[in-house]
């Protein structure tokens, strides 16, 4: 919040010579260049391995953004298992695994299993040294597996106003889901009360 008017500064927990220790960000542009150079250096050092772990395709949360897909934190245990891997082994060959994520979408599940299988088909795994063959190092033939937005094929058609509102339909669907339990309970209690009256 900006300071306005000639009033005392509230909660002024300053110390002596605090002006000498103000944090400024005049190096923002320089830091950006430094980070870019560091990424390039690391990429050259670990080449031909990719910079980051393989991430899953996930659908963004909330009604506003759920039409888009993006990279997630890690593959679910079910996805890893369906691809014929174990979580511990997957982590050693450059695959991110997130034990907390749950699958609620069959399309995304299938896409991620396919992504894992494609990754497995393109990697070359060999022992890091002769003594410990279980410790692997990964060489990736294709370093990146980009996440593409699914194409939406929309055909041109005449505009029709049938009096239905997409917003209202979604709003009612959400409301119905939210209150389904309490409505069923009320209906059940009402039916029981009527049955009691008839007796």
UniProtKB/Swiss-Prot annotation:
Query: Is Phosphoprotein tagged as a keyword?
Result: yes
Sequence similarity: Belongs to the eukaryotic ribosomal protein eL13 family.
GO cellular component terms listed in the entry, alphabetical order = cytosol; cytosolic large ribosomal subunit
- What is this protein's function per UniProt? Component of the ribosome, a large ribonucleoprotein complex responsible for the synthesis of proteins in the cell. The small ribosomal subunit (SSU) binds messenger RNAs (mRNAs) and translates the encoded message by selecting cognate aminoacyl-transfer RNA (tRNA) molecules. The large subunit (LSU) contains the ribosomal catalytic site termed the peptidyl transferase center (PTC), which catalyzes the formation of peptide bonds, thereby polymerizing the amino acids delivered by tRNAs into a polypeptide chain.
Q: Which GO terms describe its molecular function?
A: RNA binding; structural constituent of ribosome
Q: Which HAMAP family match?
A: Ribosomal_eL13
Query: Assembly state and interactors?
Result: Component of the large ribosomal subunit (LSU). Mature yeast ribosomes consist of a small (40S) and a large (60S) subunit. The 40S small subunit contains 1 molecule of ribosomal RNA (18S rRNA) and 33 different proteins (encoded by 57 genes). The large 60S subunit contains 3 rRNA molecules (25S, 5.8S and 5S rRNA) and 46 different proteins (encoded by 81 genes).
GO biological processes: cytoplasmic translation
- Highest classification ranks of the organism: Eukaryota, Fungi, Dikarya, Ascomycota, Saccharomycotina
Main location as per UniProt? cytoplasm
**What residues bear Phosphothreonine in this entry?**
144, 152
Relay the record's extra comment: Present with 133000 molecules/cell in log phase SD medium.
**Protein name (record):** Large ribosomal subunit protein eL13A
Q: Which InterPro entries match?
A: Ribosomal_eL13, Ribosomal_eL13_CS
Q: Does the keyword Protein biosynthesis apply?
A: no
Keywords from UniProt, A to Z, are: Cytoplasm, Phosphoprotein, Ribonucleoprotein, Ribosomal protein
Where does it reside?
Cytoplasm
């Amino acid at each position: 919040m900006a300071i306005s008017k000639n009033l005392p500064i509230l909660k002024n927990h300053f110390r002596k010579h605090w002006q000498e220790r103000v944090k400024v960000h005049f190096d923002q542009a320089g830091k950006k260049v430094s980070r870019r150079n560091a990424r390039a250096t690391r990429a050259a050092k670990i080449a031909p391995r990719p910079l980051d772990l393989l991430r899953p395709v996930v659908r963004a949360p909330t009604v506003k953004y759920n039409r888009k897909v993006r990279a997630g934190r890690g593959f679910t245990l079910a996805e890893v298992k369906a691809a014929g891997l174990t979580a511990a082994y997957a982590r050693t060959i450059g695959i991110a695994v997130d034990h907390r994520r749950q699958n609620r979408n069959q399309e995304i599940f299938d896409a991620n299993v396919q992504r894992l299988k494609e990754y497995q088909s393109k990697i070359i795994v060999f022992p890091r040294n002769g003594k410990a063959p279980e410790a692997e190092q990964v060489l990736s033939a294709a370093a990146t597996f980009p996440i593409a937005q699914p194409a939406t094929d929309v055909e041109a058609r005449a505009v029709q106003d049938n009096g239905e509102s997409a917003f209202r339909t979604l709003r009612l669907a959400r409301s119905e889901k939210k209150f389904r339990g309490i409505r069923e309970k009320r209906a059940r209690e009402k039916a029981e009360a009527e049955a009691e009256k008839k007796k």
